[in-house]
Amino acid sequence: MAQTAYTQGPSAIADLMIPKLLSPQTIQTRPGLVQRVRAMIENNQVSGIAGDLMAMAERLDSVPLLKQITCPTQIIVGELDQATPPSDAKLMADQIPNAHLAIILNAAHLANIEQPEAFNQIVATFAQELGKEKQN
């Protein structure tokens, strides 16, 4: 995909990535949000987009390191996420001691902007639970 960025530009990357980042329902019913995500992608320099894509493609598997995480961890994933599918998020949650996993319905990779109320509620609940633990 990095080559696509260099040869066809940011718009081509947006065309490829938007279906992975947003749910089909969002793409069909929220054109303003789709345009906002498109602008976020297209406003980047080609070299930055290509560099990010190459770095993601070449990154090492860090799953073995997850067991070393000792801080409270909340993993949030969209049920339709293609970039980090729920099965991958579950794998992470299973490897991190005492991790919490939340799956947001009708959302993909950008669940925080597709379903902000659900996302914010998960974060708020997690933070409240941390506060209760600290008091005890």
Short names for language-model regions:
Residues 98-136:
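Catalytic active-site module of serine/aspartate enzymes centered on a nucleophile-bearing elbow/loop
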Residues 17, 53, 92, 119, ...:
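Hydrophobic "lid"/C-terminal helical patch
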Residues 65, 72-74, 97-100:
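Structural signature of beta-strand start/N-cap positions in the alpha/beta core
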Residues 43, 59-60, 82-83, 110-113:
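A short, basic/aromatic alpha-helical/loop segment that forms part
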Residues 20, 47, 74-76, 102:
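Conserved hydrophobic packing residues within short motifs/helices of P-loop NTPase cores
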Residues 7-68:
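Conserved alpha/beta-hydrolase catalytic His-Asp/Glu region
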Residues 71, 85-94:
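Short alpha-helix in the alpha/beta-hydrolase fold that links the catalytic acid
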Residues 69, 75-77, 81:
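Short beta-strand/loop motif that positions the catalytic acidic residue
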